[in-house]
Design a protein with these regions (language model features):
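Short beta-strand-to-loop elements that line the ligand-binding cleft
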Residues: 52-62
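Secondary-structure junction motif
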Residues: 26-50, 117
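Short amphipathic alpha-helical coupling segments at ligand-binding clamshell hinges
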Residues: 39-42, 112-126
Length: 130
């Protein structure tokens, strides 16, 4: 699930949910192409599909720098809720009515019949089915 990430003091931090319309003029902190060309392309394409030209204030190269910039109030971000750590000093607000999405993949050898692998796969499937 995708959320808008803000500092604790940001005016939007107390909202129950946000839409693209709510954030269209907000300065954004984004992960650079170093995180993956395909990721970056999909991210920008989602803005296009949402009818928004993002106001990119800062590009950062890793998740720690990303969360730090947001927590310091340099801008807001969009990310999957699963990557936010409780120690990040940020607020995660669900983003509704957007083309932004998070894709996950898990790989394993099909001939591996260990019970722990099967249990883990069931856990992952159940978790992301929510």
């Amino acid at each position: 699930h995708i959320c808008v990430v803000t500092s604790l003091e940001h005016p939007l931090s107390h909202k129950e949910y946000l839409t693209i319309e709510d954030i269209k003029n907000e300065p954004l902190i984004i992960l650079s192409k170093k995180q993956g060309e395909e990721y970056y392309h999909d991210y920008m394409e989602s803005f296009r599909l949402d009818g928004m030209i993002p106001y990119i204030k800062k590009e950062v190269d890793d998740l720690n720098e990303y969360m730090m910039a947001i927590s310091l109030g340099e801008g807001i971000g969009l990310t999957a809720t699963e990557v936010i750590n409780e120690n990040d000093q940020v607020v995660a607000i669900p983003l509704k009515e957007s083309h932004h999405h998070a894709d996950y993949a898990v790989g394993y050898h099909r001939d591996n019949e260990k019970k722990a692998i099967q249990q883990f796969m069931k856990y992952v499937e159940d978790y992301f089915r929510l």
